[in-house]
Amino acid sequence: MKFELDTTDGRARRGRLIFDRGTVETPAFMPVGTYGTVKGMTPEEVRATGADILLGNTFHLWLRPGEEIMRKHGDLHDFMNWQRPILTDSGGFQVFSLGDIRKITEEGVHFRSPINGEKIFLDPEKSMQIQDALGSDVVMIFDECTPYPATEDEARKSMQMSLRWAKRSRDEFDRLKNPNSLFGIIQGGVYEDLRDESLKGLVEIGFDGYAVGGLAVGEPKADMHRILEHICPQIPADKPRYLMGVGKPEDLVEGVRRGVDMFDCVMPTRNARNGHLFTSEGVIKIRNARHRDDTSPLDTKCDCYTCKNYSRAYLYHLDRCNEILGARLNTIHNLRYYQMLMEGLRGAIETGTLDAFVADFYTSQGREVPELVD
């Protein structure tokens, strides 16, 4: 992978990630394909929304279908018929989400399979081996996602273990002679000094990109903004910056304003299946009765297949009848909305008009622009 940085507007950055399988324009949003599929979508449909890269889930793909089946197909690209870049998370966050059914030690994590209760052990080395089998273009180190809330001492211990796991991940990645890219993950909770220590340790190990982890796990939005404003300027400028698991459209806007290059989140697809649709004027709840006889499209500013061909009344009808097509059309729209938002942000950075773009984004929804600390 090669990262090119074209221009900046304030802290916001416009560039691209160049892979053998294709180029990813940044800032970029990655749709989430947890089990090797963006729910309800064919790869061609996902690509048509403007997606350059997808995210796959190491933990879930390891449990089902497993490494052996993946290697029989070649890799995850061949298995799911997506011949463009794929980033896979390491499984750390999913293990964190298991709660009481997992035990974290220095060696790794012991837990029971959420599928059949089988005892399983996952460590940095195994995570690297699984992601090698997946053929991930971007591999993430195995880390512990620091919970919120956590005391500073708890966050320090978690972060320092993640640093030790980062070194083990790097060593195993190199031992496997994996030709792809490996990203480090900055931890430290809401504590700036711990974030500094984490980044310093990761840079000493050396990675192809740096992710900010452990945010959007329950902390106030102001804390997320504060940590991003503090840590992003310290990340090496020639490396991509990835904010993991974020988020709402406004979170993408605020992340870009603070120098983030990459995002992922299940929100556009999950919300689509629940009838919550993003538009240039805010969120529409399509199952609300006021849409029952509305012949207008979801968003007159959207060029997606759904908005060009169907009315709000039809989408309301599909939702009320629990038709599969409704979830699919909603997903197409939400994914396209996210990609159009990223296209707009990239264009605004290129032309030096990001402030105006951000102001229009918020005012069109009747909201105030959040303060950005200089």
UniProtKB/Swiss-Prot annotation:
One of its GO terms (molecular function) is metal ion binding. Pfam families: TGT (PF01702). Substrate binds at D89, S90, G91, G92, F93, D143, Q187, G214. It comes from the Bacteria. InterPro entries: ArchSynthase1/Queuine_TRR (IPR050076), TGT (IPR004803), TGT-like_sf (IPR036511), tRNA_ribo_trans-like (IPR002616). It catalyses: 7-aminomethyl-7-carbaguanine + guanosine(34) in tRNA = 7-aminomethyl-7-carbaguanosine(34) in tRNA + guanine. Homodimer. Within each dimer, one monomer is responsible for RNA recognition and catalysis, while the other monomer binds to the replacement base PreQ1. Belongs to the queuine tRNA-ribosyltransferase family. This is Queuine tRNA-ribosyltransferase. It comes from Shewanella sp. (strain W3-18-1). The lineage of its organism: Bacteria, Pseudomonadati, Pseudomonadota, Gammaproteobacteria, Alteromonadales.
